[in-house]
Amino acid sequence: MHFRKIVYLCTMKKTEFSFIGDIAKMFGSLPHHGFEPIGDDCTVLNIGDEALVLSTDMLIEDVHFLRGASSAEEVGYKSLMVNISDVAAMGATPTATLLSLSLPESAQGEWAEGFMRGFYEGCAKYGVALVGGDTTASRDKIAINVVAIGRAPSDNIKRRSAAQVGDII
């Protein structure tokens, strides 16, 4: 597929899944280096008898949370949970996370400390290590990106494509 056609398709107003489908088509011909291609909540890299499972999600202020309606601790905890739940749903045990924060001046200091307390609470509860990330300033909204990493036996991966009604995760 030609790049211009893909760019046009990606700029049209679409559902999340049709947009992801366009991205998968655009990048599908590139090498995956052992990772499973786009199409599930996580990607999987099989390493012998073990699988490394990775997921990422973004949370944007006024889209995924309202600063006035949720405490900073709640937002921190939720940010981790939405990611490690994807890893767990694939049959893996969450083990590590990367956290990137873009904070306006109004969220630096007390709000950021509360956020980190909530994020820490989730990490401590589920035995997840924070192993890296990034911080930057933003103009007026909070943007949060979390990468969750988990491990599982290669033969225990639960894929959305194989899910059946009544399955228990």
Q: Which residue stretches match the model-derived regions?
A:
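Short Gly/Ser/Thr- and Asp/Glu-enriched loop/turn motifs at secondary-structure junctions
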Residues: G39-D40, N83, P94, K141
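Residue-level signal for inorganic ion chemistry
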Residues: V44, N83, G91, L130, ...
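Glycine-rich anion-binding loops of enzyme active sites
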Residues: D49, L59, P94-I169
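Small-aliphatic-rich amphipathic alpha-helix that forms the alpha element of a beta-alpha
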Residues: A72-A96, R117-K125
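Residues at secondary-structure transition points
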Residues: G39, S70-E74, K78, E110, ...
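Extreme N-terminal cap/leader segments of soluble proteins
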Residues: Y8-S71, M90, L99, G122, ...
